[in-house]
């Protein structure tokens, strides 16, 4: 496994999972979804209502817990290639974000943050776009 893939896995894994368990369980993105909604001044209910209204065809179950790690990795790589972002740039961005988050949360007495948000930031993509990409890959529309 190359260092980029390892760093990506460790970033996803940074809070709450041991790597041996990650391969057996699906990654839960609830904290990321809450953070994204808060960033835009809305609630999770509003988010799902918006998705239904716009016919994005992403169910609540898919958004929260139906994203196995291999699918997440494929989506990250697909977006990275499409946007022509180097693995080095993503790695560097994740490292800088980790440092910034740790400084902020250490001052609050906690480091409970969504590490997945750092990957979205590094790819410069919002959660909805990421979920749509996952669905396209899952349905075989994108390799």
Q: Which stretches of residues belong to each language-model region?
A:
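A short, Lys/Arg-rich alpha-helix, primarily the initiator
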Residues: 1-17, 54-83
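Residue-level signal for the short linker/turn that defines the boundary of a DNA-recognition helix
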Residues: 17, 28-31, 42, 74, ...
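Short alpha-helical DNA-recognition segment
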Residues: 3-29, 84-103
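Short, basic-rich loop-to-helix N-cap that marks the start of a DNA-contacting helix
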Residues: 25-39, 108-121
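Short C-terminal boundary/hinge segments that cap the last helix of small helical domains
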Residues: 41-59, 124-143
């Amino acid at each position: 496994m190359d260092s980029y893939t390892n760093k990506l896995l460790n970033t996803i894994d940074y809070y709450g999972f041991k790597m041996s368990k990650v391969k057996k369980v699906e990654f839960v993105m609830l904290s990321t979804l809450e953070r994204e909604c808060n960033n835009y001044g809305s609630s999770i209910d509003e988010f799902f209502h918006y998705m239904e209204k716009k016919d994005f065809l992403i169910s609540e179950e898919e958004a929260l817990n139906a994203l196995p790690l291999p699918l997440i990795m494929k989506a990250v790589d697909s977006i990275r290639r499409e946007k022509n972002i180097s693995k080095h740039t993503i790695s560097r961005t994740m490292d800088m974000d980790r440092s910034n988050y740790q400084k902020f949360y250490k001052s609050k007495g906690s480091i409970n943050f969504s590490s997945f948000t750092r990957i979205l930031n590094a790819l410069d993509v919002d959660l909805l776009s990421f979920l749509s990409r996952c669905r396209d890959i899952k349905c075989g529309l994108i390799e």
